[in-house]
């Protein structure tokens, strides 16, 4: 078998989640969800701050996928000329729940150490009625739509075993700015990405974090001024961004976070390290679709999360990125370079032979 990396959302129901887990465990092969939003600059630096205790104990988190897809509905794959909706609009019409949760949930789950000392235990989901979605179907089919399942806006509340709360939102219908929220509320500080990036810390924590106020009235009633925020980010810049950040900006790919994600995947595989996101992350982040549907179809009842780790969620203490020792990293890099050179040499020979024919 081969190690596998799957584009988000990777699994759309519990059965698919368990199939991936069982296969990964049986074959002893990695199965990583390609959640690029875990590698954006604000999320990575904020994760490092959270892990260093800057916000105290993080007790609440928010994430979202709010993205008006009106310019894109006509560009999704269609199953022949008779398909007026395209696969994505059709899927939203037939399925309730947060069907694209991982962009919002992934980064906050890492900050809360999910299945590394805590686990998501119960959720309650609510949605609005479908107004925009229903109108989209009617406009494309020229007929009444009496059953658009996915509400225009879905909100899922999750409580963890350790008493933390996560709020995840999904809205691809209404006209509003792109928003993944990404908000952490801690006992000593606060972080927020959308719509305005900022940090707020209590006075003692500000001093403890080594950021000295330059104004007299600096307090947690407002975000840190720009200079203090830049100093905080500089102090807690994530090691992965130090290594890949500038190169990622040059290469691009969703601002560079795709490059960082791919680089970390390759790095971990080359060095024999645990991946940044495992098959249990995949299942936990993707299962909101079916669990939320179960909740809303039963009068927004609480629904229990399966323990995809089969009781092992509290064995590893704290989410961490894995790193090789410098000498091991250098050896793996040289080995990879030699292998790549060999492939290029072989490819050039085969290409030359093909041109002669």
List where the protein language model places each region.
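Ligand-binding pocket scaffold of soluble enzyme catalytic domains
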Residues: 21, 27-28, 65, 257, ...
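C-terminal helical cap and adjacent loop that interface with cofactors, partners, or active-site loops
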Residues: 109, 177-185, 192-195, 201-357
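Active-site beta-strand termini and strand-to-loop segments that position acidic
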Residues: 156-162, 186
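Beta-strand-loop-alpha-helix segment that lines the small-molecule cofactor/substrate pocket
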Residues: 1-39, 53
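A short catalytic or substrate-binding loop motif that flags glycine-/basic-rich loops and adjacent residues
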Residues: 102-103, 147-152, 160-161, 175-176
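Aromatic/hydrophobic pocket-lining residues that form π-stacking "cages" and hydrophobic walls in ligand
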Residues: 20, 46, 291
């Amino acid at each position: 078998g081969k190690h596998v990396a799957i584009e988000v959302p990777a699994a759309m129901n519990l059965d698919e989640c368990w199939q991936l887990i069982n296969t990964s465990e049986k074959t002893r092969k990695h199965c990583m969800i390609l959640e690029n939003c875990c590698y954006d600059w604000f999320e990575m630096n904020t994760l490092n701050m959270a892990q260093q205790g800057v916000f105290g104990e993080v007790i609440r988190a928010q994430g979202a996928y709010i993205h008006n897809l009106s310019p894109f509905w006509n560009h999704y794959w269609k199953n022949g000329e008779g398909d007026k909706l395209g696969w994505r609009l059709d899927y939203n019409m037939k399925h309730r729940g947060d069907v694209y949760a991982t962009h919002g949930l992934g980064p906050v789950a890492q900050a809360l150490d999910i299945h590394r000392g805590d686990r998501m235990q119960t959720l309650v989901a609510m949605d609005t009625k479908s107004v925009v979605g229903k109108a989209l179907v009617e406009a494309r089919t020229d007929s009444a739509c009496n059953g658009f399942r996915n509400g225009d806006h879905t909100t899922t509340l999750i409580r963890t075993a350790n008493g933390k709360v996560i709020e995840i939102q999904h809205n691809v219908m209404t006209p509003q700015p792109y928003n993944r929220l990404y908000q952490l509320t801690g006992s000593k500080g606060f972080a927020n990405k959308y719509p305005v990036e900022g940090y707020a810390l209590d006075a003692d924590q500000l001093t403890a974090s080594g950021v000295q106020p330059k104004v007299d009235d600096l307090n947690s009633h407002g975000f840190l001024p720009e200079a203090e925020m830049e100093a905080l980010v500089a102090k807690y810049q994530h090691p992965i961004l130090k290594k890949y950040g500038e190169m990622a900006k040059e290469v691009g790919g969703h601002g560079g976070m795709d490059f960082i994600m791919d680089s970390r995947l390759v790095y971990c595989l080359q060095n024999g390290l645990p991946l940044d996101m495992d098959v249990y992350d995949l299942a936990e982040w993707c299962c909101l679709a079916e669990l939320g549907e179960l909740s809303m179809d039963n009068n927004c009842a609480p629904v229990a999360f399966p323990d995809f780790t089969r009781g092992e969620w509290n064995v590893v203490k704290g989410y961490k990125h894995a790193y090789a020792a410098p000498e091991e990293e250098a050896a793996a890099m040289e080995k990879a370079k030699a292998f790549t050179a060999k492939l290029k040499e072989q490819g050039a020979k085969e290409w030359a032979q093909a041109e002669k024919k």
